[in-house]
Amino acid sequence: MDDPVADQPDGTDETPDGDTAGSSPIGLADAQARAREAVAELLEHPFDGIITAESGADGGWRILAEVVERSAVPDTQDIIGRYEITLDDGGRVTGYELRERYRRGEMKEEL
C-alpha cells in the first residue's frame, strides 16, 4: 500500500490534498482553548481570562492568562496572577511563567 505522505520529487512531503505533512498550525481559538486547559492542569487555580494571544514567527503562540490565586470578599481584593503560556505550532505547552501578581481592584496597564 502506498504511503499517502510520500517524498515528492521536489523534496517536499505533501499529502494528496496538497497539505505539507506535519504543518498544521493551530488557530487562535484552539490556542486559547489549549492555554485554558493548561491553566487548569498546571496551575490548579480558577481561570479568570485571557489578556493577550499572539502568534509567533515559528507558528507557536504566546498567551497571557489570568487566574484567581486567592479569592477574597470583596472580590476587588482577589489576588490575580498573570501567567504567560507558550505553545508550539501544534498546540503543545512548551512553558509557562508567572509574569505578575496583583489585587483585582488595582488599576493595571496592560503588558
From Swiss-Prot:
Keyword Cell membrane: no
Top-level taxonomic group: Archaea
Keyword Isomerase: no
InterPro entries: Gas-vesicle_GvpO
Bias kind Low complexity: ranges: 18-31
GO biological process, one term: gas vesicle organization
Compartments, as annotated in UniProt: Gas vesicle; Cytoplasm
Positions of region (Disordered): 1-31
UniProtKB keywords: Cytoplasm, Gas vesicle, Plasmid
Induction and repression of expression: In PHH4 (a deletion of the p-vac locus) not transcribed in exponential phase, transcribed from stationary to mid-stationary phase. Small amounts of longer transcripts that include gvpC-gvpN-gvpO and further downstream are also seen as well as short transcripts that only hybridize to this gene. Gas vesicles appear earlier when grown in static culture, possibly due to O(2)-limitation.
Extent of Acidic residues compositional bias: 1-17
GO CC field: cytoplasm; gas vesicle
Main location: other
Family: Belongs to the gas vesicle GvpO family.
Subunit: Forms homodimers, forms a GvpN-GvpO heterodimer, interacts with GvpC, GvpF, GvpI and GvpL, might interact with GvpA.
Further information: Encoded in a 14-gene locus called c-vac which produces cylindrical gas vesicles only in the stationary growth phase.
Function: A minor component of the gas vesicle (GV), also found in soluble extracts. May play a role in transcription and/or RNA stability and/or in GV assembly. Gas vesicles are hollow, gas filled proteinaceous nanostructures found in several microbial planktonic microorganisms. They allow positioning of halobacteria at the optimal depth for growth in the poorly aerated, shallow brine pools of their habitat.
Protein's name according to its UniProt entry: Gas vesicle protein O2
Organism: Halobacterium salinarum (strain ATCC 700922 / JCM 11081 / NRC-1)
Gene transcribed to yield this protein: gvpO2
